[in-house]
Regions:
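N-terminal prosegments of processed precursors
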Residues: 19-97, 367
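Acidic, glycine-anchored loop motifs typical of Ca2+
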Residues: 218-231, 388
Length: 534
């Protein structure tokens, strides 16, 4: 008897090869001669390598520095794999995303590795209404011939995966998601994960066939009646390679079976679009937080990676959004348990947010994104079509206010974030949004220059600067972070005066300036900061 759990989730049918970025930090690997060595992982499922403490690329088998010829061969292999993985997205540009009312998650064991986490716990992590957890552990590693121990404490988490997608969509979509299994596959984990996940397609195929044999009706997962299952998510037992698991483990990713040598048909439907991730965190030894799941499921929705997917130049000049964003390094926030909420751009792309275009000079009061449900857009000509997944002009800037609350609790800082968008259908389709220093697709405008591999509080305004003048004729000055998280600033030199704006949501309170005093506007009534009606 299969056990099915339901959860409110979201899905779409965009299918481009995408994956989790490698977790930064030292991990221990064992060479073929038994020697242990501290290494650092770079890249993602489709293009990755490891280095030693000095930054030398290492041979995966011997853990010795590669020769120039070996590195060139690795670069060629990575390029070939990227080219092979580039697939065309199903047409969605300029049209409504195809949101499936139900989705399927299949738990699988390997022949030599079974789930140690109870199915009920996985269920709660995916769909629990009030999911929470706490734990602590010591992580020991060697660096520069010295041994260090890092004590990690997680005293609470953001919530379940269901809660994450409900929150970041502001409750606009509530499909059902079913969790089944675990089922046991026919082979050891190394069979599916070896040689850069060479046989992972067979894991997806077997998982679907085992679920089908158990009575799962796949026809309910073809929302648009196109003869294909909208998507399948496989959660596999044990470690994943992205956060330090052995090389033979599978790297969490999103892909399409139709662009591999594997074909799968169940209940007369083709299985194509899939995502997968691991049960256990290599660092903690406990079940993985929702960060990886939410990152991979965001690809199912149609969102691309925002870290550098080219791999070869990682951390050597391309500064991406890092811990600020779920599609970059953010899924590792709070030990992988509290990924950041969707940015204004991601909500704009999904159709959940329509930013306001700044035109004339004004003194702006901008509430935190999740309170005001608002963002501001700046572009040449001061006019925009406001279609997130087919923008015109394609180049524009978004300003949003973020505070360290809710899913954003573990952001590097808070305040005003300004992001430059340079949309290219080709780069989005091929998951290469931020692979060129001169052609970044989603580029955080750091308030203070930051070239490190870590996001900083000074990336935000006003922590890094109280003005922004990088975009001619769209200057922001007097940027101020107020108690409660809102920001104010002068746009195009406007003086601070009373701010008259509309309410962002039916019952959402909004702080405003009235005759130089801070007041709160809610349901058509003005209140002072003590809650007295004015």
């Amino acid at each position: 008897m299969k056990k099915i759990f339901s959860v409110l989730m979201i899905s779409a049918v965009a299918v481009t090869a995408a994956a989790m970025p490698a977790r930064r930090g030292p991990v221990t690997r064992t060479a073929e001669d038994g020697t242990e060595k501290t290494v650092f992982l770079h890249g993602d499922a489709f293009s990755h390598h490891m280095t030693d403490e000095a930054g030398n690329w290492l041979d995966e088998t011997t853990l010795r520095p590669m020769s120039a010829e070996q590195r060139a061969a690795r670069l060629q292999k990575n390029a070939a794999r990227r080219q092979a993985r580039r697939v065309q997205q199903k047409e969605q540009v300029g049209s409504t995303l195809n949101l499936a009312p139900r989705g399927l998650l299949i738990m699988v064991n390997f022949k030599d590795k079974a789930f140690t986490t109870p199915a009920d716990t996985i269920h709660e992590m995916i769909n629990g209404e009030n999911f929470n957890r706490s734990y602590e552990y010591d992580y020991t590693y060697t660096y520069n011939r010295k041994t260090y121990t890092q004590h990690v404490v997680v005293d609470h988490v953001g919530g379940s995966a269901r809660r994450y997608f409900h929150d970041v969509s502001w409750g606009q979509y509530n499909p059902q998601f079913d969790v089944v299994g675990p089922y046991t596959l026919s082979q050891n984990y190394a069979y599916y994960g070896r040689n850069d996940d060479a046989n992972v397609g067979y894991m997806i195929k077997e998982a679907c066939e085992l679920a089908d044999a158990d009575g799962v009706d796949f026809t309910v997962y073809d929302n648009n009646n196109d003869g294909e299952v909208d998507f399948v998510y496989v959660l596999y037992a044990g470690y994943g390679e992205a956060d330090g698991g052995p090389e033979e483990t599978i790297w969490p990713h999103n892909h399409d079976l139709n662009y591999t040598r594997v074909r799968c048909t169940v209940d007369g439907l083709e299985v194509g679009n899939y995502a997968c991730s691991n049960e256990i965190s290599y660092y903690s030894g406990m079940y993985n937080g929702v960060g990886t799941f939410c990152h991979e499921f965001s690809h199912v929705l149609g969102l691309p990676d925002l870290y550098e997917t080219n791999n070869e130049n990682s951390w050597l000049g391309l500064h991406t959004l890092l811990e600020w964003d779920i599609l970059d390094y953010g899924p590792y926030n709070n030990d992988g348990n509290t990924p950041p909420a969707y940015s204004a751009y991601e909500r704009f792309f999904m159709g959940w947010l329509k930013p306001r275009v700044l035109t004339d000079a004004e003194y702006v009061w901008l509430n935190p994104l999740d309170i005001g449900r608002e963002a501001l857009l700046m572009c040449d000509g001061d006019a925009h079509n406001l279609v997130g997944n087919n923008p015109n002009p394609a180049t524009f800037y978004l300003a949003e206010c973020r505070t360290k609350t809710g899913w954003d609790e573990y952001l590097p800082g808070e305040g005003l974030l300004i992001t430059k968008i340079k949309y290219s259908n080709y780069n989005w389709t091929n998951n290469r949004v931020n692979n060129s220093a001169n052609n970044m697709g989603v580029d955080l405008m750091e308030a203070k220059a930051n070239t490190s591999e870590y996001a900083e509080p000074t990336d935000a305004f006003p922590a890094g600067s109280k003005q922004w003048t990088a975009y001619a004729d769209h200057e922001l000055s007097q940027i101020t972070l107020l108690d409660g998280g809102a920001v104010t600033f002068s746009y195009r030199g406007a003086k601070p005066t009373a701010i008259e704006t509309v309410q962002p949501a039916d019952d959402a309170p909004r702080k405003m300036l009235r005759d130089g005093q801070v007041v709160i506007f809610r349901n058509g009534v003005l209140y002072d900061l003590n809650g007295r009606a004015l």
